[in-house]
């Protein structure tokens, strides 16, 4: 007899090795799957692969009328089972096809659209109905017929510049999307000569330029770096070619009025390793964190300087600025070791060190670089701002590149977190750090919840810095669904509204709040077209008779 709502569920006997943590496995879960485990950075292993729309998403609380724009998130999610190379057992969590989630806020309502970025890689595999690509950034593990295609999945970040909405991943150039339908429109819209473009370009609040770089800019495992600035009209106005000290993983950067500062992680790409079927990247405990300072508008690579610190990973920056002494100040997350254990070291000795060290310590810190000093100088130890695992810091982007006060940071909430987890797998809250006041407020997402990178929307165009709303996706692990929480920065500890999706979406890597004012045709177009004011049935077919 099937259990009623008041009865305990009927237990199904399964081998202990296959039992889920809650002790019950549904019979269909015992059937073989063509999908390998495909984890994201948060540790989730379930592909979602959803494309579609939701009109007027269900909301708890009240959406502030001041929210006028779109909250975009981009996520890695495999459109096809990633089994081509070794059954997918070596797949990296940062790989997977880019899929964009868009929450459109207007007049206190929210519509939702989700769609894959139709990259060349996506189109190849969609036509084939199977996986054709192997390891992350290793074409030697791809099917021979696709090795000369651009294998970027455009899954890392989005930005709006010069009226163009871009989806980006650092192993290729950007794809352009329609900001309303999310249809893919083209590749490399600014015609950059580099083979690659960072997923973390910065929009200068002073000049309006999009400032960025590409690394491995002339091909696999090359040390070539390309610096560029694109003005608000879409024209490249500054560019410079330079070389990194080694072929390093250069994910994020910091911007000041006079410098672009690159952060080199201690990984190294090696062509021989790739040809042998190994990973693009290997962590190296003998290499230091390295910073490259590029004077904005520089005409010669001789103007570029390098700086070093200990081993570790400054993963993402909040922002950068210059103090009254001309020193560069950068606030960033910092992991004291390898935060990407899926790219282990080459040597057995270093692999043993990674294993024995366990989960590396993570913090939010402040770096100081004096660009007047000689190149190749070791930096002083950074100042610790938050001594708790911290990642994905964001600011009020109206102050990008200049001195700022407020930072919004993904954190492990003190006393409510498991500090033994990888920094990406225990982020259960947000911190509002007020630099000038020296204070920190905490928002806790709730039990059995993880929270993703925040974004900030100012209360008005002329609102004081940090006065507005923070939005972030909360993964409700207990309910297997996702929701956007909205926090008023005037009372940071409590959400004022939650936009509740009826399902879970993948853990995103990055996202942006794009105001309606800078989105082309924002008022005339929506994420979802409204039905035409034309009825299929004439009034005579209605059951209502106005004469009765």
Curated annotation (Swiss-Prot):
One of the Pfam families matching this protein, by short name: RPE65
Amino-acid positions noted as binding Fe cation in the UniProt annotation, renumbered to this chain: 200, 251, 316, 510
Signal sequence coordinates: none
Binding site for piceatannol: 136, 169, 391
Keyword Iron on entry: yes
Co-factor note (free text): Binds 1 Fe(2+) ion per subunit.
GO MF term set: carotenoid dioxygenase activity; metal ion binding
Reaction it catalyzes: trans-resveratrol + O2 = 3,5-dihydroxybenzaldehyde + 4-hydroxybenzaldehyde; piceatannol + O2 = 3,5-dihydroxybenzaldehyde + 3,4-dihydroxybenzaldehyde
Enzyme class (EC, first level): oxidoreductase
Cofactors required: Fe(2+)
Entry's EC annotation: 1.13.11.-
Residues annotated to bind trans-resveratrol: 136, 169, 391
Keyword annotations: Dioxygenase, Iron, Metal-binding, Oxidoreductase
Disruption phenotype: Does not affect biotrophic development, nor virulence.
GO terms for biological process, alphabetical: carotene catabolic process
Family classification: Belongs to the carotenoid oxygenase family.
Primary role: Dioxygenase that cleaves the interphenyl C-alpha-C-beta double bond of resveratrol to yield 3,5-dihydroxybenzaldehyde and 4-hydroxybenzaldehyde. Also cleaves piceatannol, a compound that differs from resveratrol only in the occurrence of an additional hydroxyl group, which leads to the production of 3,4-dihydroxybenzaldehyde and 3,5-hydroxybenzaldehyde. Exhibits a high degree of substrate specificity, as suggested by the lack of activity on carotenoids and the other resveratrol- related compounds.
Name of the protein in its database record: Resveratrol cleavage oxygenase 1
